[in-house]
């Protein structure tokens, strides 16, 4: 923390298998720091981070990703020249048929035929890019996905729809999800 203080201390958190956990609190309360510690983007000064009893504290983000931990940033990355289908294949780590790629988009509430060949760029709205990011989570088959303030950059209507998408996503995933939010709904 600026000035050398501790941002987070005394945390004992267990994320159950196949559950959706929402962590809320005020801005500056350490929510994003917690997400970055779990994902491996930041290292703790002390303590342990365990995944299924295995100490992963010293593993970096790449090693944790190989174990099935993924982190979705507040503002998803946009790629000029990369289509939605390309992004889904990158997430899956394999070539997908058009039907497979479209099935991920349909599950997050997007009309697949309209989006599958679109570029992941500034022409997509905040809500669209969030849904595409959720589709990549489905394609990735991760054990633990951390969403850091997924409501950032989208309007209230899109946010309310996104809540439903998260609930449906949780039911179809074979893994856990953490949503970090300053919204207390």
Where are these regions (language model features)?
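Q-loop/switch helix immediately C-terminal to the Walker
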Residues: 75, 81-100
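ABC ATPase NBD coupling module
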Residues: 55-70
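Walker B catalytic motif
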Residues: 149-150, 157
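ABC ATPase C-loop
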Residues: 137-138
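The feature captures the beta-strand-to-loop junction immediately N-terminal to the Walker
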Residues: 24-26
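Helix-to-loop junction immediately C-terminal to a conserved catalytic motif
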Residues: 39
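Conserved ABC transporter NBD signature motif
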Residues: 47-54, 67, 100
